[in-house]
Amino acid sequence: MPPGRKQGAGCWTCRLRRKRCDSVQPVCGSCQSLEITCYSGEARPSWMDGGSDQKHMSESIKARIKHNAMLRRERRLMANEDHDIIMTMETDHRAPGELMNSGSALGASSSSRVSNPVLEYDSLADSSASTPSTSSGRPTTLRSSVDRFDEGQSPLTVASWASGPPTLSSGYSASSTRPAVPIQVQLGSAMIYLDYVFPFLFPFYQPSLIETGRQWLLGLLCQNDVSFHIASSLSAYFFSLVPQGDDQDMHDDCKALVWDKLIEQMDLAIGSIQSTVSAVSSSGARTPLLDKTRIMQEITQLLIVEVTVRNNVNWQIHLTPALSIFDEIFKSHGLDQSSKPSLNILSHALPSSIPVTTQHHKSLPNTADQSALTFFVSLLLFVDIMASASLGTSPTLQSYHESLLPSQSDQDFHISLEKVLGCQNWALVAIGNISALCAWKRDAKRGGNFSIFRLVSLAEPISQALERGLKDLDTSPPSPQPTKTSAGRLEAYYSRHDKAIDHKFTANITRIWAHAAIIYLSVSLSGWQTNNNEIRAAVAQVLALLEMIDSPGQLRSLSWPICIAGCLALPAQVPAFRRIVGTMGPLGKFGTLSNALSIMETVWNSRDSIDSNTWDIASALSIIGSPALLI
């Protein structure tokens, strides 16, 4: 029959989908718009049998429609810089809540610390990772760990890092006739992650050109397929939350599809890291330092993503092995002559990609691996402190604080948490010390040897450190600005980011953390007393400082102090905390601030039932079911 002619009651594809068909030959309008195969003709297809073949074909077509919708969306994402995208889909989907429940097995693992976390990480991860679909409806992007699963191979081994970056595929996949995602779309998703997602997660991290900028982050994405896919999926999820103007929000079906893809990639990552940890465990001490650091980075990256997008996730199954590897690499490669941990020694133990044949009187710029190591060491020290507050335990890495997190940086290679998190070292170290104090208090009461005088004496140095730190913030002058000569302008450009955050502003960020620490310490000493003068003054200070912040990314980074101050807020202050969190809009779902608000709301609704003598910060952070990691 000539093209454009109509025939019969519609094509077999539309009949299978129970959709209206315009019966145009050889491809009807519905199939053409959805970019799926149009099965036309008088003869009934063999799969239209009312049985298993018909069901399988129906599922295959649904998956194909989803895949094509994703490709159309990504093509539009690349073409429209103003993010003006509206999509509709004609397919069933799983709701985000159902998907979150399907991944809730992550929380099934015991909260206790494993005896050998690196060796047992794979068994813990088994309980949390769902098996990825291998149906023809699964999108093909990079030649990823999905393909390795299909081939019965290990998704990731230590040796895979030496084989170079993942290959950006084009044309057709070897295992399918479906077209792969165009390379422009793959790179576009990576650029969204580099330009928008990562800066939103870490708004204070602005390394200079001399520090190699963020090139290490691109290297991390190219390190293996899993990292790339997680970043790409996280970019899509972030994009789905960004307000796109009046009446232009993304379609709910598309949001569900993006969420589905993100969960799939996170589950793949768990399986991949599981395989890697097993390989390293079998290699033991023979595993190169660079491989160990990259494994630590992979686990930490997954931890951040899990906590960012999932509620009530069992984050301990990721944090425990990451901290174990941290401890192992420092003890094996990062101790100085006095057996103290040194990031300088550990950093220089990494292999250099730049051959040095002559002696240099000045230090060379960091390599990408050194910059990545510094970032993740900083991040793990911070996450460990936040975890200790949630669990009511001493920080696992507390013995590293004195050497790696000094109050005042000197010429040695020390960590500056301010460069990564916007908060100076002393405030976060104080929070870790308060967690250790809470652990001591609990154990002393259980052992029957608790002394209030001993508690006060242990708390005194912490209180003094907080007072001294706040006083120094008030008296220390701002960082000097570079001179307005041509050389000064050039130096300002390559030594600091041209949009570097002002010293006075980061001082306010540190003040917020410090006042939250004061609240934490007061509760540890006096119990849950919202009318305590010291607590009331600190809550008021936090609230006033929060009013000065207009950046959603910076507000997101303050989830913990917002939650601590909000939980102890007076009823009259509650609307202000709700309003501040509400300014995040849809982006409040991207990160832990929404979780912090849930905790605050539950605490506010439980005021009358809280026992002020036994209730503490760890109790509050666990009030919605499991300890919350607010990072």
From Swiss-Prot:
**What does the record say about the knockout?**
Completely abolishes the production of pestalotiollide B and significantly decreases the growth rate. Reduces the expresssion of 43 of 48 PKS genes present in Pestalotiopsis microspora.
Q: What induces it?
A: The expression of the dibenzodioxocinones biosynthesis cluster is positively regulated by the transcription factor dibT.
The UniProt record lists the keyword Disulfide bond: no
Recite the UniProt keywords alphabetically.
Nucleus
The organism's place on the tree of life at top rank: Eukaryota
Q: Where is the composition biased (Low complexity)?
A: 123-144
Taken from the UniProt record, the cysteine pairs bridged by disulfide bonds within this chain are none
Question: Which Gene Ontology cellular component terms are annotated?
Answer: nucleus
**According to its UniProt record, where is this protein mainly located?**
nucleus
* Places the protein is found: Nucleus
Q: Which residues bind DNA?
A: 11-38
Query: Where would one find coiled-coil regions in this protein?
Result: none
Instruction: Write out the ranges of the annotated region (Disordered).
Output: 123-148, 469-488
Which InterPro entries does UniProt cross-reference here?
Fun_TF, Zn2-C6_fun-type_DNA-bd_sf, Zn2Cys6_DnaBD
From the UniProt record, which GO molecular function terms apply? DNA-binding transcription factor activity, RNA polymerase II-specific; zinc ion binding
Q: What exactly does this protein do?
A: Transcription factor; part of the gene cluster that mediates the biosynthesis of pestalotiollide B which is part of dibenzodioxocinones, a novel class of inhibitors against cholesterol ester transfer protein (CEPT). Acts as the key transcription factor within the cluster and positively regulates the expression of the cluster genes and the subsequent production of dibenzodioxocinones such as pestalotiollide B, pestalotiollide C, 1',2'-dehydropenicillide, 3'-methoxy-1',2'-dehydropenicillide and 1',2'-epoxy-3',4'-didehydropenicillide.
Name of the protein in question: Transcription factor dibT
